[in-house]
Amino acid sequence: MAGPLGKKVAIPDSFSPEILFPISRDNQRKDKDLIFKKGVDIWNLHEVFWLDQDSVTNHDELSIHIPADSKFTVESKSLKLFLNSLIHKRFESLKELIDTIKRHVENLIETSIKIDDIYQKQELSSKKIIVNSDFSHTPKVNDHSSITRF
C-alpha cells in the first residue's frame, strides 16, 4: 500500500486510524553502517483538537517520542490526517485520547512510544477586571501627558 505523501487525499470524514502509514528506516540506513544506541524522534503536535462526551471541543498540544532505533517511523502527512480525524470520535478524557493515539501509532511502527501533554492550560482567574471607560481626557496639541517615554 502506498502512503498519502505527494497525493491528493480527502480529509477524513470519520475517525480514520487506517490512514496511518509506516515508513521503513531501512532505506535511510542501508549501506551507512549506522549503530543507534540512543536517540529519539520528537514530533510536537500543536493542533490536536478533540471532542469530549458532551461534544465540547478541546485543544491540546502533544509531543510524540519515537525511539531512533525503531524499524519504522510514521509518515508525516498520514499522521496529520489521522490527528485531524480525531475530531470525529468522542473521548472520555485527554488520557483516553493519548492512549488511542499511542495504541494506533505503536501498532503501526511496531515499537513503544511516549506521548507527553505539552500544553499548559491557563487557569481561569476569579479576579475582577476593571475597565476605565472615562474618555474625558483629550490631549491638546502640546499636551505630552499621554506619551509614554522609554
Predicted regions and their residues:
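N-terminal intrinsically disordered, cationic/polar leader segments
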Residues: 1-150
